[in-house]
Amino acid sequence: MNINRKRYKVEMHDAAEMLKAMAHSDRLAILKLLCKNQADGLSVKTIYEKLQLQQPVVSRHLNILKNAGIVRRIQVGQKINYCLCMGKSTIESLVKCFY
């Protein structure tokens, strides 16, 4: 197997893992919300209140997205917020495919 083929397989595997992490309606809603609030990100509380979900559910989904490298935690003053790791346009393009 040549280097380009190996690289391609790795890239496709990474893309599949990322899409797998996004493959839930609540996670897509979280990503859409984070797209609109990219500057300072959003707290877990803000996310669960806006989406009318339970806090443990949002925390679990954010953890899955964080482990996939899609979102990251940032500290804003005393609070921990979540924001997108990927470029806003990339996420918006992906989310638009589903909405």
How would you describe each model-predicted region?
Residues 67-76, 83:
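Beta-hairpin "wing" of winged helix-turn-helix
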Residues 46-48:
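A short acidic, leucine-rich amphipathic alpha-helix
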Residues 15, 36, 81-99:
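Conserved segment of winged-helix/HTH DNA-binding domains
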Residues 54-57:
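Helix-turn-helix DNA-binding motif, specifically the short coil turn and the N-cap/start of the second
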